[in-house]
A protein has these predicted regions:
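Enzymes that bind and transform nitrogen-containing heteroaromatic metabolites
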Residues: 1-245
């Protein structure tokens, strides 16, 4: 892997960890992979665009995060499970002196997470459900009884700014958002995104979900802070420009 910006050099795992490590404090980092025509899935999942380098960065970002934020649709489509202590991410977290596991926080306006989901039954760190007051109270109560940490953030829709406040109150300040596109769009529209880590795969897909499903209220301006390359895949790290967040 070559780092192109700020300098050109080979990057090993230790250097890659330092390249993505954040200073203490609250931060919302969004991590996506997309094709050259901005498709984020092939046949409904992101794996068709992935690469070994993308997987390395995926592991590192999860290892550095306090919590992983994901929309319910993406969690279902991608078969999300909890982070296990003996997984590659769990072992890396341990080497970095962090707790071996971290919770998954699922965003669902309707509290659509089911009590028999692997995110509920198999989670080592209790899964967090971020929903709103309009969601079925019976479903919310059942999930809470099953061990899910239920956060009601907003009345008729999820208030992401409030959700991040609530996560911070639980000690989860550095948040890694893994999608999907609707959640990224909502977070950008709410002005809560600090960073976008976008892997650009050298492929053209032609259909499937796109990085953003629609127009934003205002154009989001970003500043390129880092660019790496491996096997033709570009790994970008953008920070939202002042005034955008």
């Amino acid at each position: 892997m070559r780092q192109l910006i700020p300098t050109s050099a080979e990057v090993d795992d230790a250097a890659l960890i330092e390249a993505y490590r954040l200073p203490p404090g609250r931060w919302l980092r969004c991590n996506f992979i997309a094709s050259l025509d901005a498709a984020v899935t092939v046949n409904g999942v992101s794996a068709g665009l992935g690469s070994p380098g993308d997987r390395r960065i995926f592991h590192i970002l999860r290892a550095l995060a306090d919590v992983v934020l994901v929309g319910h649709g993406t969690a279902s489509a991608e078969g999300y499970r909890g982070i296990e202590a003996d997984s590659a991410v769990g072992r890396l977290r341990t080497r970095l002196g962090r707790p071996a596991t971290a919770p998954i926080a699922v965003v669902s306006r309707r509290a659509s997470l089911t009590t028999d989901s692997g995110l509920v039954t198999d989670a080592v760190s209790p899964t967090v459900l971020i929903t709103c007051a309009a969601a079925d109270p019976v479903r919310r109560a059942a999930l809470a009884d099953a061990g899910v940490t239920v956060l009601v953030c907003g009345e008729d829709d999820v208030d992401l700014r409030l959700a991040l406040d609530r996560l911070a109150e639980l000690g989860h300040e550095q948040v890694l958002c893994e999608g999907g596109p609707a959640l990224l769009h909502a977070a950008l529209a709410a002005g809560v995104v600090d960073e976008l880590d976008l892997s650009i795969a050298p492929a053209l897909v032609g259909d499937g979900a796109r990085l953003l499903p629609g127009a934003l209220p205002d154009v989001a301006r970003l500043e390129l802070r880092q660019l790496l390359e491996e096997d033709g895949v570009l790994f970008t790290r953008y920070v939202l420009a002042p005034g955008t967040r």
